[in-house]
């Protein structure tokens, strides 16, 4: 883990990364916000599908659980991606564009997400890649802010 759990808001926020995979080798490479359990987690990852960025979101032991996917042109080149979470307002952003949404669901309870890891919550699926920037915002950003943040 890294940072301070005081900098993470479990009820709303944005996980932002400017990242590139070392290879498009069809393996999961994850960055996660979690609490060390399967109950509540946000996993931003290059998936086992070629050139695909995904988010797995799970809150309150599965009261809300979904996956958002988007195909990028090349995961070995730097991409700016962001995932916004807020009750009934979830979105994946990539290179200046909102690419996938989920419009219903609850978020984790306050002070639930406590760790930021370059792997899955259980220590698997290490992120093998390059990182220029990684940030967690304590509030859900507006569409205009996310456009600006993720534009290359």
Task: Show the residue positions of the predicted features.
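Short, aromatic/His-centered strand-loop micro-motif at the edge of beta-sheets
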Residues: 57-80
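Short tryptophan-centered beta-strand motifs in secreted/extracellular beta-sheet-rich domains
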Residues: 76-94
């Amino acid at each position: 883990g890294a940072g301070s759990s005081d900098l993470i808001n479990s009820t709303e926020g944005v996980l932002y990364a400017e990242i590139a995979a070392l290879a498009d080798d069809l393996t999961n490479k994850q960055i996660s916000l979690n609490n060390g359990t399967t109950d509540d987690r946000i996993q931003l990852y290059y998936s086992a599908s070629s050139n695909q960025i995904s988010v797995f979101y799970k809150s309150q032991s599965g009261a809300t659980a979904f996956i958002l996917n988007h195909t990028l042109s090349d995961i070995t080149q730097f991409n700016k991606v962001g995932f916004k979470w807020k009750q009934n307002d979830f979105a994946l952003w990539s290179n200046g564009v909102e690419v996938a949404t989920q419009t219903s669901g609850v978020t984790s309870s306050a002070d639930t997400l406590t760790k930021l890891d370059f792997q899955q919550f259980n220590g698997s699926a290490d992120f093998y890649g390059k990182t220029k920037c990684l940030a967690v915002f304590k509030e859900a950003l507006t569409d205009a802010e996310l456009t600006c943040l993720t534009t290359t």
